[in-house]
Structures are given as C-alpha cells and as structure tokens.
C-alpha cells in the first residue's frame, strides 16, 4: 500500500512542474514551482511526523507483548496455543501492522499471549536467522499461531484477513 502511495506521489511530483510550466507564463511558472516545492516539503514533514508517531506507538504496543529471544524460539520454550510476532521497529510495514494487530486482538478479546521476536539484527545474528527459517519467515511483519500439537499457522493476509484468521485459530 505504501509502495503504491510512494509511486503515485513520485509520478505527481515529477509531472506537476511540467504541467504548470506548460499552462502558465514563465513568471507564473516560477511562482507555481515555488508553491509546489513548499507543498512537497510540507508533505515530507507530515510523513516524517506520521512515522515518528507510528514508531512511538510501536514501542508502546511491543511493551504489552512478551519479548522473547531466538534461543527460546529454537528450543520450543514458548507456550503453545499463543502467537509469535516477528518484526522490528525500523520496518515501516511492521509499524503499520502492529496497531492493527493490537486493535484487532483487543476487539476480538483473543485469549492469546503474543510473543515478540525483534528481528532488527537478523542480518548479523545467526540465531535469529535460524528462528526465522524454522517458521519459514522470509520477511516481516510475520504473525504465527503456535499450535498445541507443535505445528504452526502463519497469517497470510493475501488469503485471509486478520479478523478471519483469529476466528480460524481460536477454533484450534
């Protein structure tokens, strides 16, 4: 979603000066270009402010989860029948997903504890890489239901919504 928005913004930003200069005299084009630049800066500041708010919210939500480490994940020390969330604060998709997860979980009064594995250092921490491989995690955010029979169910938002998925896994 963010990729589409960024592409659309890029196209608009690139084509706006062309259309403005084609429709006005040179002095008006200069004024329009200045206005366009100010608008771009304003939009950029709004995006930065939005990202800062999401980062703060991410940190607050993660505090309500049970933070875990890769060793506990690899050694099956997490209580089955709960959720395991792979993510990191620097991931824009994780920052967008986490408030939705928290809100949906609260709305459905899910009985699950949510374990959180911070994948920030996955590129240099082999244990985190192994934990991700164990559950076939290729990217974040990833949410997994740890079945009581030692299996697992991965949320795939291309196939089901988070509320639908909660309804499915609450039947296990």
Q: Where are the predicted features?
A:
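Thiol-based oxidoreductase modules, predominantly thioredoxin-like and allied folds used
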Residues: 64-68, 86, 110-127
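C-terminal motif of bacterial Sec signal peptides marking the signal peptidase cleavage site
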Residues: 18-22
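Local sequence-structure signature of Cys/Sec-based thiol-disulfide redox active-site neighborhoods
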Residues: 69-113
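Stable alpha-helical elements in mature extracytoplasmic
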Residues: 93, 97-100, 128, 161, ...
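Bacterial N-terminal signal peptides that target proteins for export
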Residues: 1-10
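Solvent-exposed loop/turn segments at secondary-structure junctions
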Residues: 89-93, 119-122, 150-152
